[in-house]
């Protein structure tokens, strides 16, 4: 597949041919489930003829049906463009197809999608990751030049790692959330999934920057990073030793080999442990579900989306939500409502926010003395469908990504090897807030070393 950097140099005729080639591939690979709607049903022609970018199904594109992979939003057509879409259109990039996801971005496998699951292009028996599994699968399978996803607790980095792509989660507030279907407003962040580090940086540049329409967008000066990538710059990298040691044997072997290559290239590598990580999962799921409970209260069958049959207003609310939401979404709404209820708010939510502050301080302390943090993206490579049928087991698999969202830091997943089933292993690099340049420099160095 042509890279994003190459495609941006194409003539209008070459871009037209690329779009036709992608459309033919998408139809041929329909069983992969990377996309959720036939391209013919989308108003692609009205959105410009730029380089095609796949869009996760929770990002508003004017004239498109946007459902967050949920039955409750059946029939909803976006009346406006998200800010990231407007930015794409101004940079000779254009939306090209809706990618599958876990319902309302709640999951790590795409199995909770109303449209059905997406398959991992590397091995169809294994999950592609989530919640941006469709975006990652599309890029990995050559069905997209690059894609946009959203990351609340690893939803860009984990599927990118499982499918063998590069996934970048920007600093919280760096990319506008205006037009994103909200899951957890203090954690959500839109970012790119791409074939390589340079393409990820190019797409990041296209969507980043302050947006007055988004109250969570930070008014921090933005400077392009893709034209200043330096993979030869020597960096101080701190490895989270206990995270690497606790990964599966094949994941650990690939990560340790990557660490040795970083050392041999002249990077300064030190080791430390995260001592209090036992609170990460609990803090994340308390905060995320509490915010989800509030955000998803707007879906009631009255204003937009699917409306259930009912005899009165109460039945309309109950039936629309009961029939429209999937089991995982219902579970998280219930949990979030519980932790916000009288008598439990102080016991759970306030404590979770204190744990969040502690997690952020722990990251900041390490990054005071280092340029980057190195750790796994996931404890193992992509697991088989149904392997994590227990919700708690599934939540625990997010252990290496969720704390980065709690801290609001930028992070990237970079492929570093394969296991004996040809499944991808990725390393995760984390940088100081607003320092995506150092993050990309380190990722490019690692990518170069792995590719040789």
From Swiss-Prot:
Catalytic activity: L-glutamyl-tRNA(Gln) + L-glutamine + ATP + H2O = L-glutaminyl-tRNA(Gln) + L-glutamate + ADP + phosphate + H(+)
Active site per the UniProt annotation: 56 (charge relay system), 131 (charge relay system), 155 (acyl-ester intermediate)
Cellular component terms (Gene Ontology): glutamyl-tRNA(Gln) amidotransferase complex
GO BP terms: translation
Keyword presence, Kinase: no
Pfam families: Amidase
Family, similarity comment: Belongs to the amidase family. GatA subfamily.
Assembly mode: Heterotrimer of A, B and C subunits.
HAMAP family (UniProt xref): GatA
Protein name: Glutamyl-tRNA(Gln) amidotransferase subunit A
Organism in which the protein naturally occurs: Campylobacter concisus (strain 13826)
